[in-house]
């Protein structure tokens, strides 16, 4: 089973050897733009995607950035281009500087209710590896899975080692700016000041997001609300190390970034004992058996 996929990036040669990096699929897509092939000119029509699910819009964005260009094909299965839904997106060629496919996909994922989007390698046949775009639906933005794996931490034992917890206070207000210039620039505000107005208040924290590629005010409001929903709670982020030599630990390839897991904690100073639903954000390691797992930020259980 393939676990890591990349394209050969910058290569450096010496008289004795060569070295190169692997570029991820998002790095490749950051160098492709969502523009209709053969029709880039002043006044050219926009790419309009209407009445589709967000993951179908993402699939179409991927097609325009790959199959829709000469020598643009990449070994990616984009999925259903026609899945119906209540979403629309318009991409104007004059806004090309904001239309790298990677940026567009990130904005689709980060809008309020946006789906998780990931790329997973698989063996297309005995000799070829392809990628499959896996994305959540409009009804359930998370990537589907068959089994929820369990990890546990407690003093002296458990399948988790080196547990660390980073804490972050809430963001109560988000300013968003959209298309336009100077006084004509579109703006939107999302706020919830509940934490500022309680008896022992949190100090107000504000964020600003820019979405200059959209002149749709409702979409701009969705970006602002999406950021507020993500950051409003007092948050914590758990990072831990697991040893693949431990039979209690799931194997690489059994879990992927984006998967839900259960983390059982007992005796940690700043997290109450209990079982916590967590979502795997990142996995890292080397050729050894130790793997570092970083989970998505979650609502801080010590602040509830």
What is each residue range found by the language model?
Residues 35-42, 151-153, 294-298:
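Short intrinsically disordered coil segments
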Residues 1-23, 27, 262-297:
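Short beta-strand and beta-hairpin "edge-sheet" elements
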Residues 1-82:
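Surface-exposed cap/loop segments at beta↔alpha junctions
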Residues 137-283, 303-304:
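Acidic, small/polar-enriched beta strand-loop surface segments
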Residues 10-29, 78-170:
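Short beta-strand-centered interaction patches in the first periplasmic/extracellular domains
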Residues 58-63, 105-110, 262:
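Generic solvent-exposed, charged/amphipathic alpha-helical segments
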Residues 130-134, 253-256, 288-296, 304:
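Extended non-globular C-terminal regions
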Residues 1-7, 118, 173-175:
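Ordered hydrophobic segments in well-structured contexts
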């Amino acid at each position: 089973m393939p676990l890591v996929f990349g394209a050969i990036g910058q290569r450096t040669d010496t008289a004795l050897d060569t070295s190169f990096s692997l570029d991820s699929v998002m790095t490749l897509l950051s160098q492709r733009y969502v523009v209709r092939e053969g029709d880039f000119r002043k006044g050219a029509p926009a790419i309009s995607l209407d009445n589709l699910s967000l993951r179908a819009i993402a699939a179409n964005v991927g097609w325009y950035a790959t199959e829709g260009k000469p020598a643009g094909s990449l070994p990616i299965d984009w999925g259903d281009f026609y899945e119906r839904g209540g979403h629309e997106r318009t991409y104007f060629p004059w806004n090309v500087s904001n239309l790298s496919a990677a940026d567009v996909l990130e904005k689709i994922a980060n809008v309020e209710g946006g789906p998780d989007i990931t790329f997973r390698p698989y063996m297309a046949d005995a000799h070829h590896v392809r990628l499959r775009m896996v994305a959540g639906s409009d009804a359930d933005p998370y990537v589907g899975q068959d089994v929820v794996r369990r990890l546990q931490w407690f003093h002296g034992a458990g399948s988790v080692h080196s547990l660390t917890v980073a804490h972050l206070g809430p963001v109560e207000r988000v300013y968003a700016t959209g298309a336009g210039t100077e006084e004509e620039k579109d703006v939107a505000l999302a706020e919830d000041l509940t934490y500022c107005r309680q008896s022992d208040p949190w100090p107000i924290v504000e964020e600003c997001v820019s979405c200059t590629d959209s002149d749709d005010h409702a979409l701009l409001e969705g970006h602002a609300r999406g950021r507020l929903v993500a950051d409003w709670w007092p948050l914590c982020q758990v990072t831990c190390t697991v040893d693949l030599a431990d039979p209690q630990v799931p194997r690489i390839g059994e879990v992927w970034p984006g998967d839900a897991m259960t983390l059982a904690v007992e005796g940690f100073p700043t997290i109450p004992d209990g079982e916590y639903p967590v979502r795997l954000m990142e996995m890292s390691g080397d050729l050894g058996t130790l793997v570092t797992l970083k989970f998505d930020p979650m609502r801080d259980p010590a602040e509830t």
